[in-house]
């Protein structure tokens, strides 16, 4: 089940990266970008923990939040 959810999440993230992201200006304050971080987190930890890490990272990515290099733990 986790495998299928991981594949679904990765597909949605890749769709965003290739179809939506090129249409909007870059604004991620971190490296790797939030979408790449999400891919790495889901691949490393699976859909549930990786998805939770990705959501927490996206929530931190705003002008008053942090910035810089923030790899997947």
From Swiss-Prot:
Belongs to the UPF0161 family. This is Putative membrane protein insertion efficiency factor. Keywords: Cell inner membrane, Cell membrane, Membrane. Pfam families: YidD. Could be involved in insertion of integral membrane proteins into the membrane. It is found in: Cell inner membrane. It comes from Neisseria meningitidis serogroup C / serotype 2a (strain ATCC 700532 / DSM 15464 / FAM18). It is a peripheral membrane protein.
């Amino acid at each position: 089940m986790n495998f299928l959810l991981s594949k679904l999440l990765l597909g949605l993230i890749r769709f965003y990266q290739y179809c939506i992201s090129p249409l909007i200006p870059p604004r991620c304050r971190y490296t790797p970008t939030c979408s790449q971080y999400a891919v790495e987190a889901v691949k490393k930890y699976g859909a549930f923990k990786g998805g939770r890490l990705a959501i927490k990272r996206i929530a931190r990515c705003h002008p008053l939040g942090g910035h810089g290099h923030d790899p997947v733990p």
